[in-house]
Amino acid sequence: MGSRLNPSSNMYIPMNGPRGGYYGMPSMGQLQHPLFNYQFPPGGFQHLQQQQQQQQQQQQQQQQQQQQQTQVQQLHNQLHQQHNQQIQQQAQATQQHLQTQQYLQSQIHQQSQQSQLSNNLNSNSKESTNIPKTNTQYTNFDSKNLDLASRYFSECSTKDFIGNKKKSTSVAWNANGTKIASSGSDGIVRVWNFDPLGNSNNNNNSNNTSSNSKNNNIKETIELKGHDGSIEKISWSPKNNDLLASAGTDKVIKIWDVKIGKCIGTVSTNSENIDVRWSPDGQFIVACTRDDHLALIDLPTIKTLKIYKFNGEELNQVGWDNNGDLILMANSMGNIEAYKFLPKSTTHVKHLKTLYGHTASIYCMEFDPTGKYLAAGSADSIVSLWDIEDMMCVKTFIKSTFPCRSVSFSFDGQFIAASSFESTIEIFHIESSQPIHTIECSGVSSLMWHPTLPLLAYAPEINENNKDPSIRVFGYHS
């Protein structure tokens, strides 16, 4: 027999053990076989399991507490680093602001000396009483002295000159502001030399054309002919002051060397072009077409690298950020599509994000001189300002009830000018978002601030009753 249940115990007692051994009844308190010598606590095995579970839970809680303490310490370290970075950035911004203030003060001092010298020279002139005096200086305007900014622009005059015999479509300064070009529906690009001091200088290597300019510091130097249709947009190289690209409805992009007055390259895009832009390093060009294609052109070889088709999106304008890392496209959906530029990749571009902000088609966009902000003008009459790093809209400017056609930042980033189909150009102070000055004119197709001076060039529409000149430059002080 294997075992038998003892009536006086809850335990099985082996019955075949040796006589005289150490087996005994549990109730007698004698030494028992090691198998039965363990004193079980109240509750038996369930109590042991509960103790083990409690110990495991305590260990897990301790581990979680340690992890939380570690995370809190890491977060504290990150916040401390961010705080130090913010302090460094604020210090750098303060230093840059002081440097800018010193520069502006030196400029004001120089202008004051020049003005004093001019007044002394003209004091004996009989005609000096007929010369309007403008005393407001261009400086760093803030929300506390907006009246001075308004007064400054109200004292400015406009100088105009005639070149295009048909509608002007685009106007652009070269990188150093020594040349200004305009394009027209007649398929001709016209280039003028520009000297802010009034010293005109013709290009002896080009076929000069006569100028009807009313001032002596802008003089037409050359006509560039080669397109078979209207030229919709022109763009200067940011690295070469004599290279110019033109986008025509004849389905080609032309690269011009203004110094010799000749086309040095032609690239077919297989569709009517509406916009063209150089990359900041001058190595690439992007062009968008009327049938919503984007052409990427390599400049050293002057060949097309790739043509992209965007279905369902009517492209209106294309552009680069100031670092050349992003290609942005404005479309008829009121959105801006941001693409990462990958020059060494076979695809060359990768979609990053869509910027939603307008209820109607976006016609124009432009980066500020620092590259921090992007302005976009829309058919909903709103100009939006975007922080390109965060890709968030941070500010808006209300132009009017008319669609915005062109936007441009001043050289120092203080002001933004916006034109529309109506007969005005509005100048806004960016920091305060306030309108500062209105330029009365016919509808403007294109405008652009000078790269180093507070001068605004624009191409007015031709009015049948009052034909405007091809190009006007606003911002002169007497």
UniProtKB/Swiss-Prot annotation:
UniProt xrefs under PROSITE patterns: WD_REPEATS_1, WD_REPEATS_2, WD_REPEATS_REGION
Signal peptide annotation: none
InterPro entries (alphabetical): G-protein_beta_WD-40_rep, Tex1/THOC3, WD40/YVTN_repeat-like_dom_sf, WD40_repeat_CS, WD40_repeat_dom_sf, WD40_rpt
One of the GO biological process terms: mRNA export from nucleus
Residue spans of biased composition, Low complexity class: 106-125
WD repeats (start-end): 163-202, 226-268, 270-307, 310-349, 357-396, 399-438, 440-478
UniProt feature, compositional bias: Polar residues: 126-140
SUPFAM superfamilies registered for this protein in UniProt: WD40 repeat-like
Lineage: superkingdom: Eukaryota
Region (Disordered): 33-53, 106-140
Family: Belongs to the THOC3 family.
Listed name of the protein: WD repeat-containing protein AAC3
Organism: Dictyostelium discoideum
Gene: AAC3
